[in-house]
Amino acid sequence: MVGVVFMDETYVAPEDAKMSIFDAGFIYSDVVYDALSSWGEYIFRLDEHIERFSMSCEGFRLENPYSHDEMRQIVAECVHRSGLDSTYIKLELSRGVIPNAEDGRDLRKAEQRFVACAVPYIWLWGEEKSKSGGNIHV
């Protein structure tokens, strides 16, 4: 698979990225995410996306482990390491896994997990139509 994933403080290939099926983000949809795009060296509205992501984390009472500057660097490095001209970028902060089974479902004890990835951008309408525009009938 093409792209790169940042998790557990390291960059890995998408096929090597693993998460527990007991992660609250998976079980309860207890996760904050944002999606961005890049074309060439330009990452579309990066600062606005990071700000929105941070506000969502606060709303979910999740502690984002990275500053805005660190997140900018992580995203830029994901795009760079992907080697792609156009990318779909996703940021996720999950409530995480409760490390001790004796704690049951006490999500306050979960270990949060941040993940970022950059994978090939998919032109839903095709690249030309996306640039020139199209008609939508509702």
Where is each model-derived feature located?
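Conserved alpha/beta cores of soluble small-molecule-handling proteins
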Residues: 1-138
